[in-house]
From Swiss-Prot:
It comes from Prochlorococcus marinus (strain NATL2A). This is Acetylglutamate kinase. One of its GO terms (cellular component) is cytoplasm. Its main location: cytoplasm. Gene3D superfamilies: Acetylglutamate kinase-like. The gene is argB.
Length: 304
């Protein structure tokens, strides 16, 4: 009798009606399939920053997204910042953060803290988060393997703030081919051996170009490029390279968005297929961008 009851229950479960939620799940998987096939063994560089780094729930969503992208064969490179945590540690150590034109003034003492926080703490937290979701991440900075050579920005008025002088991706290619996820902090040495702090957006863009990446994705605290910075509904979903330059020239793109768009422009000019500025405050925004028809945020197109 018990066996008959179990069989009846099993039969009932098999014949259970398909719900709307079930249909949505199937639809999502079906929509994702061509993108999974398209981006298998392709390289995507992701700049991880903003609220997605500060909020624990968003952090976990990003780590899951990165693990999923890697598990279906996408070759992922993660570049990260960590400004808020740097400020917290400077405060703990009694060092007052100083900024000029939006950039941190980085003397030797401050640079020691920047390197400690970015490379020793934030980087390892990200590596651990990805590893906890079943993938193998490797923590690096620009110094490792001569990955990035820095050049002091401008006339040195910002101290040890640098820009990218050279990129050598030799250390990255074998890691990517073996399925590892390189996680890179934006600290690099200049030719004279001095550590420099480089804007993480800039590092991500230059790495994307050097790696011949399919996409550059910047996680931000904004929906994307807005025609009116105070109106989220003015989001520009797609824009060509020439149009992006015009928005900067006209002053529509300004302040914190300007260096991000400039980063996209430089990477596209060097052969990256597409650059995306997306809202990292939206859970699973990476998957929405890569694996759905509609995408999310702003796509800056380099071709056509």
């Amino acid at each position: 009798m018990n066996k008959e009851i179990q069989q009846a229950k099993h039969s009932k479960n098999i014949n259970k009606p398909f719900t709307d939620k079930d249909s949505i799940r199937v639809s999502v998987l079906s929509e994702a399939l061509p993108y999974i096939q398209r981006f298998a063994n392709k390289r995507i560089v992701i700049k991880y920053g903003g609220s997605a780094m500060a909020d624990k729930t968003l952090q976990n969503a990003v780590f899951r997204d990165l693990a999923l992208l890697s598990s279906v064969g996408v070759q992922i490179v993660v570049v990260h910042g960590g400004g808020p945590e740097i400020n917290q540690w400077l405060e703990k150590l009694g060092i007052k953060p100083v900024f000029l034109d939006g950039l941190r003034i980085t003397d030797t003492e401050t640079m020691d803290v920047v390197e400690m926080v970015l490379t020793g703490r934030v980087n390892k937290q990200i590596v651990s988060g990805i590893n906890n979701h079943g993938r193998l991440a490797v923590g690096l900075c620009g110094i490792d393997g001569g990955l990035i050579e820095a050049r002091t920005l401008g006339g040195g008025s910002h101290g040890l703030v640098g820009e990218v002088a050279k990129v050598n991706t030799k250390i990255l290619s074998p890691l990517l081919e073996e399925g590892y996820v390189p996680v890179i902090s934006s600290v690099a040495n200049s030719s004279d051996g001095k550590s420099h702090n480089i804007n993480a957006d800039t590092v991500a863009g230059e790495l994307a170009a050097a790696l011949g990446a399919e996409k550059l994705i910047l996680l931000t605290d904004t929906p994307g490029i807005l025609r009116n910075e105070n109106d989220p509904s003015s989001l520009i979903e797609k824009i060509r390279l020439s149009e992006a330059r015009e928005l900067i020239d006209k002053g529509i793109v300004k302040a914190g968005m300007k260096p991000k768009v400039e980063c996209c422009i430089r990477s596209l000019a060097q052969g990256v297929n597409a650059a995306h500025i997306i809202d990292g405050r939206t859970p699973h925004s990476l998957l929405l961008e890569v694996f759905t028809d509609a995408g999310i945020g702003t796509m800056v197109m380099g071709r056509g």
